[in-house]
Amino acid sequence: MICKNVQALTAYTPGEQPKDAGIIKLNTNENPYPPSPKVAEALRTFDAARLRLYLDPVFMALRLRIAEIHGCTAEQVFIGNGSDEILALCTRAFVENDGSVGYFVPSYSLYPVLADIRGVTRRPVALGSGFTWRAPADDAASLFFITNPNAPTSLLHDKASVAAFCRTFRGVVL
């Protein structure tokens, strides 16, 4: 019943999770700061009865606002249930059955898992000294993930470097 490539996956092993409730786990993106006063007020005035209703399935109001902020159209804005879902959907949409997924290493550990779930070739590209890279790192991949800033190195790649990579890469860059 379950695809062979999914059966072959290794289960994710989370890092140590301290039991002390007072510890903020930055490694799992917990935030040491309280929400802003605007968020706190929105939560105080939120009608919990609305949770039983579906939202606008295309999130048009949100997409329009994001488009306005970033100078694009709502049709160019994609909304999902977190970045992991969006990355998984892009892997399905942009990578054919005989395609491949490229990514830098070290980087986000989900990228090779997405390739494995999709049943396509992984194309990891080692970062150079100082965790640097140059374009194109690997132009044979169908889809190439660039994490910016990179995790776990935290290095931020400048806009010009990412744009140069996108211009020379023949596949899709996320």
Feature-to-residue mapping (PLM):
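N-terminal "arm"/small-domain region of PLP-dependent enzymes with the aminotransferase-like
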Residues: 1-53, 139-148
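Phosphate-binding glycine-rich loop
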Residues: 60-100, 118
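Short glycine-rich anion-binding loops that position phosphate/pyrophosphate groups of nucleotides
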Residues: 29-32, 83-84, 108, 148-152
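Conserved PLP-anchoring active-site segment centered on the Schiff-base-forming lysine
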Residues: 93-114, 128
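Hydrophobic/aromatic ligand-binding patch that stacks against planar heteroaromatic rings
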Residues: 114-115, 165
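Active-site phosphate-binding strand-loop segment of PLP-dependent enzymes
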Residues: 128-174
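Short beta-strand->loop structural element characteristic of the AMP-binding/adenylate-forming
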Residues: 119-127
